[in-house]
Amino acid sequence: MLANVTRSTSKAAPALASIAQTAQKRFLSVHEYCSMNLLHEYNVNAPKGIVAKTPEEAYQAAKKLNTEDLVIKAQVLAGGRGKGHFDSGLQGGVKLCYTPEQVKDYASKMLGHKLITKQTGAAGRDCNAVYVVERQYAAREYYFAILLDRATRGPVLVASSEGGVEIEEVAKTNPDAILTVPFSIKTGLTREVALDTAKKMGFTEKCVPQAADTFMKLYKIFIEKDATMVEINPMAENNRGEVVCMDAKFGFDDNASYKPKGIFALRDTTQEDPREVAGHAKWNLNYVGMEGNIGCLVNGAGLAMATMDIIKLNGGVPANFLDVGGSATAKQVKEAFKIISSDKAVSAILVNIFGGIMRCDIVAEGVIQAVKELGLDIPLVVRLQGTKVEEARELIKNSNLSLYAIDDLDKAAKKVVQLANVVGLAKENGIKIKIEN
């Protein structure tokens, strides 16, 4: 196993950095204070902190910590908090403080306001909590993560002597500084591998055993809590010669949500796209919002991705990924349209269904219901193939609705891009138009 502890190549580093991003996006993420509480639960050395949801609570938390060295951190599920800004005018979501009064003042400018970072986009995200934490001084900073890696089909340690910065930046500028250690989930993380990794990361001799112990505890969390990612950035040696996890990010497997472990009770849906929450929780629809103007309703994740690709190839930009699955009802299809049309940027919609398990006539019924009941006034291109397709075409024909029924996918994509461009141009100029087939 020790032979597997190798320096990452320039190709592997960006790939593993990408894993970290994907894990956070695909699976449940929890706030920093929840992650830190979990570290304390497993006796991992981490700074003391208290969560607060009002300025007064923040003030009391600062007094309780009883130190003049404090940090207040906005609890928003997005990276780049320190370099972000609030709609209140406050610059930065991580602030050093020296008095409880200063903590209270910063809390009043964070709580109830939106934090805008590179990851949130211009819309920002609501800050409903702050984490007041004791400040610790790092003599050395490292990066450490445990991820699930599809390439090796198991867990992998990703570590670096360059902590406290974005791992993606390290991967770009100095990929040789990243250490990757795949290991078997059957044998788990052994102490031998943990010690060797700590040495290769550059921990001082005194701190190597502490670091290895920390790695083992983090792996225990990873396994027992069904994590897909455990990321510590930075992991530090403080000025007292102790290994401390200064910040933590966890991702958890959505497929484990049925287990009574309490992790999924920590989900903060205010930090998620409400359309994604509604689609998944209420209607079992796999929806991901994007920034384009062409809505997509497709069955099957692969076909959905191919549909987005062909829209892009024809010069359009998808507004969403939406997979209705193989057993959707007409009601679910209608609700899918409701979610898509709630995005004011959508100028046209492409329905692309290949009926295997999914019947085309069911989709057609849902399309007709949606257009009639929701009063959809944007162009709709429908491409249906497969089971019950003739019945579906007959339903659409008899509905007397103004739909574009096109069998060829490339032609359907071209048409929806053309229509979206026309409607988009009209919107920009304040002109209301109605396109009829």
UniProtKB/Swiss-Prot annotation:
Cofactor info, note text? Binds 1 Mg(2+) ion per subunit.
GO biological process annotation, one example: succinyl-CoA metabolic process
Q: Which GO terms describe its molecular function?
A: ATP binding; magnesium ion binding; succinate-CoA ligase (ADP-forming) activity
* Transit peptide segment: 1-27
Enzyme Commission numbers on file? 6.2.1.5
Q: Which residues form the ATP-grasp domain?
A: 36-278
Q: Which cofactor does it need?
A: Mg(2+)
One GO cellular component term of this record is:
hydrogenosome
- Please describe what this protein does: Succinyl-CoA synthetase functions in the citric acid cycle (TCA), coupling the hydrolysis of succinyl-CoA to the synthesis of ATP and thus represents the only step of substrate-level phosphorylation in the TCA. The beta subunit provides nucleotide specificity of the enzyme and binds the substrate succinate, while the binding sites for coenzyme A and phosphate are found in the alpha subunit.
* Protein name, UniProt field: Succinate--CoA ligase [ADP-forming] subunit beta, hydrogenosomal
Q: Which gene encodes it?
A: SCSB
Entry superkingdom: Eukaryota
- Give the primary localization class: other
Protein family per UniProt: Belongs to the succinate/malate CoA ligase beta subunit family.
Subcellular location per the Swiss-Prot or TrEMBL entry? Hydrogenosome
